[in-house]
């Protein structure tokens, strides 16, 4: 099952993922799938282009593959709180958040965006950790150059993770 905004779902359709496996959300949904439940949390994209990033575009239904990188618009940012076997894992889609949406969450594990754009957000790391009650396990993610070939020397940016960890 793929859960996401309209853009995510339309990209999946372009690549022939069956509609029965697609769930379109906006944020705020909380679904029970039996052994696992997933809460969809509204979020924000990180500030790009000297804090002037705003993109309201979506990938429209009917898009066909292969999609070019210029067609892969943001389409909206979400976080997902996955609950499984008494544990909670929070995964962030970008380097930003809406504080009031997460301040009562207490995930065991959080996957946090760690690219340099998080430095444009006021006290990103301290505010995030306080809001989440200082999770025991914090895994930096999104420290990649998605335009570089997977496995290449510039695909993974170790210095981004190190800078985030020092905060």
List each model region and its residues.
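Core dinuclear metal-dependent hydrolase active-site scaffold
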Residues: 25-102
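Active-site neighborhood of phospho(di)ester-bond hydrolases with catalytic His/Asp-centered motifs
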Residues: 1-6, 90-94, 110-115, 138-142
